[in-house]
Amino acid sequence: MLDIQLLRKDLDGVAKRLADRGYTLDVAAFSALEAERRAIQTRTEELQARRNTLSKQIGAMKAKGEDTSAVMAEVGGIGDEMKASAAKLDEIQARLSELLLGMPNLAHESVPVGKDEADNVEVRRWGTPRQFDFDVKDHVDIGTPLGLDFETGAKLAGARFTMLRGPIARLHRALAQFMLDTHTQQHGYSETYTPYIVNPEILYGTGQLPKFADDMFRVEKGGAENTVTQYLISTSEISLTNTVRESIVEASALPIKLTAHSPCFRSEAGSYGRDTRGMIRQHQFDKVEMVQIVAPESSYAALDEMVGHAEAILQKLGLPYRVVALCTGDMGFSAAKTFDLEVWLPAQNTYREISSCSNTEAFQARRMQARFRNAQGKPELVHTLNGSGLAVGRTLVAVLENYQNADGSVTVPEVLRPYMGGLERIDAPAQAS
């Protein structure tokens, strides 16, 4: 959530920066609500002052034995008007809050201004795409004989669900374990296991609600307790970041660095017709998430560090990738600055997103009321960052395509072999004659 004081001080400037993000701020509506709020507050202060004066007058009149009924009646009328003003002020504050909850974060000054992904800026590349001396297959054709089962996934749950079997399931698990071990043993994160179901206010905290309700899976408790709607997490960023919700942490506890492996559930409401083949866009997928909660002055150094942590996973796996700075029009709702990592997929002959690392600055913290005690001992909003480290399913896709062999087998990347019982290659099972 944006700081309302910033809008009050520089409404036109904020409107311009929001326009760069593709959001049109209703300046007239905001100004009208603010004018009404100020008028009510001014009138309330006047009424309070008048009531105080009359209260003193009543005391003096009683001391003299004078009749106070007329003055008491006026005080009662003031009280009624103040109650009505308070109710109206609550209504205005709720409408202002609704406006604020729908506004995206402001982009950092270093973010390139642009409309969509075509305006993103490539920062660097790592690795050289492999040159194959045979016709490359995509992950569907490679993986199906090895245990990728799209047919059963669809039978069980519908489109965009996949079942993994045998060595492919083991490779998927190995990737997640490798990522967690790297982040906890080398990058300083604390491993966390989080709930997969959360309450609505948790999603307001990290910015998924109210704007993106259609992208979420809603669930209801059975039995007599089915009055509360809850949600499946679309990323463990949600639960990890909210661990500091409505709390004040000591400065000495920062940075807080958390990682978790979890399934993620997304309805993909706006993705009809996109990536319908294979595992690239699923309703359920696994991800290893990184979250950092830091002091404001450290957040951009933390963002660079987090990008480096995601890069380290790809480098250890030997997967070529590029780092892209997202433009204002392509960033997520809560982000002030985002870098995407895109991995090379030979069958598509292009780079595809595999990680997104963002600094939300105080945007989520303000919604969560997550603070730390600064050097002066005063509570101050923390900055929160999140990043994929990595999307496990898409990493599996990249391994299958980049490590495929002409005979249909897949070489297991060296760093994964300890997690695969020393297995060096995944071969398709022999066909019965």
UniProtKB/Swiss-Prot annotation:
<dbReference type="GO" id="GO:0016260">
    <property type="term" value="P:selenocysteine biosynthetic process"/>
</dbReference>
<comment type="subunit">
    <text>Homodimer. The tRNA molecule binds across the dimer.</text>
</comment>
<feature type="binding site">
    <location>
        <begin position="235"/>
        <end position="237"/>
    </location>
    <ligand>
        <name>L-serine</name>
    </ligand>
</feature>
<dbReference type="Pfam" id="PF02403">
    <property type="entry name" value="Seryl_tRNA_N"/>
</dbReference>
<dbReference type="InterPro" id="IPR045864">
    <property type="entry name" value="aa-tRNA-synth_II/BPL/LPL"/>
</dbReference>
<dbReference type="InterPro" id="IPR042103">
    <property type="entry name" value="SerRS_1_N_sf"/>
</dbReference>
<dbReference type="GO" id="GO:0005737">
    <property type="term" value="C:cytoplasm"/>
</dbReference>
<feature type="binding site">
    <location>
        <begin position="353"/>
        <end position="356"/>
    </location>
    <ligand>
        <name>ATP</name>
    </ligand>
</feature>
<feature type="binding site">
    <location>
        <position position="388"/>
    </location>
    <ligand>
        <name>L-serine</name>
    </ligand>
</feature>
<dbReference type="InterPro" id="IPR033729">
    <property type="entry name" value="SerRS_core"/>
</dbReference>
<dbReference type="GO" id="GO:0006434">
    <property type="term" value="P:seryl-tRNA aminoacylation"/>
</dbReference>
<dbReference type="GO" id="GO:0005524">
    <property type="term" value="F:ATP binding"/>
</dbReference>
<dbReference type="Pfam" id="PF00587">
    <property type="entry name" value="tRNA-synt_2b"/>
</dbReference>
<dbReference type="InterPro" id="IPR010978">
    <property type="entry name" value="tRNA-bd_arm"/>
</dbReference>
<dbReference type="InterPro" id="IPR002317">
    <property type="entry name" value="Ser-tRNA-ligase_type_1"/>
</dbReference>
<keyword id="KW-0547">Nucleotide-binding</keyword>
<dbReference type="InterPro" id="IPR015866">
    <property type="entry name" value="Ser-tRNA-synth_1_N"/>
</dbReference>
<feature type="binding site">
    <location>
        <begin position="266"/>
        <end position="268"/>
    </location>
    <ligand>
        <name>ATP</name>
    </ligand>
</feature>
<keyword id="KW-0436">Ligase</keyword>
<dbReference type="GO" id="GO:0004828">
    <property type="term" value="F:serine-tRNA ligase activity"/>
</dbReference>
<keyword id="KW-0648">Protein biosynthesis</keyword>
<keyword id="KW-0030">Aminoacyl-tRNA synthetase</keyword>
<dbReference type="InterPro" id="IPR002314">
    <property type="entry name" value="aa-tRNA-synt_IIb"/>
</dbReference>
<comment type="similarity">
    <text>Belongs to the class-II aminoacyl-tRNA synthetase family. Type-1 seryl-tRNA synthetase subfamily.</text>
</comment>
<keyword id="KW-0067">ATP-binding</keyword>
<comment type="function">
    <text>Catalyzes the attachment of serine to tRNA(Ser). Is also able to aminoacylate tRNA(Sec) with serine, to form the misacylated tRNA L-seryl-tRNA(Sec), which will be further converted into selenocysteinyl-tRNA(Sec).</text>
</comment>
<protein>
    <recommendedName>
        <fullName>Serine--tRNA ligase</fullName>
        <ecNumber>6.1.1.11</ecNumber>
    </recommendedName>
</protein>
<keyword id="KW-0963">Cytoplasm</keyword>
<comment type="pathway">
    <text>Aminoacyl-tRNA biosynthesis; selenocysteinyl-tRNA(Sec) biosynthesis; L-seryl-tRNA(Sec) from L-serine and tRNA(Sec): step 1/1.</text>
</comment>
<dbReference type="InterPro" id="IPR006195">
    <property type="entry name" value="aa-tRNA-synth_II"/>
</dbReference>
<feature type="binding site">
    <location>
        <position position="289"/>
    </location>
    <ligand>
        <name>L-serine</name>
    </ligand>
</feature>
